């Protein structure tokens, strides 16, 4: 997608008095909520997980927003909440507290918060990524000691989102997220032994609370398009080598500035390739 429909929320200040924290335990069996308890959940995901991530900084063009997350969810470790009986509005940053153990000195943890519709489609609400070597200090990162317990609080991106009644909230955890994260030099397995998700729940209604003023823009430039704009976003799989790649192409087409006659044309190709068998062959 290139955009999502939404509404405006108006707050007198932040933090808002209409936002309250709600904690959901990560429970055995993959439940999000419930009584929680001790876990022994291994997390080790394939290097090519993440092709549905979209652009890191989307501008609203050419399907730059994250797509259906169901495929990436299937390759992740997921905790899923009960079917919502009423809409749930989120405003702010969700926080994920975990106790983790790594079997390697270098590892990542990635968390995606998703809205799962009754038909199974999954929309990414927010995500967070952490190089666990930075978990104690970003200024002085240090290698992990395999087997040691690591207490982590991962703050996800700020979000403003409303889940509909009948949908579910899903937390998807992974150790990889290509191409947002470069692969670790060797696959790490994390063991999750305890966790809780803290949600910023907003108490506002469904109606828009603010109407923005009409946008102001410069006069449209005087031009003629000689050939159309084309955009391509595809995933390639080499069935011989096993390599997978995200390919993004943007062809501007030929455009003439009618004020002075300059004709321009631009072509852009991006390729993000990863080898599931060898992280050192990652290419971008």
Language-model segment annotations:
Residues 1-284:
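C-terminal, loop-rich substrate-recognition/catalytic regions characterized by aromatic stacking residues
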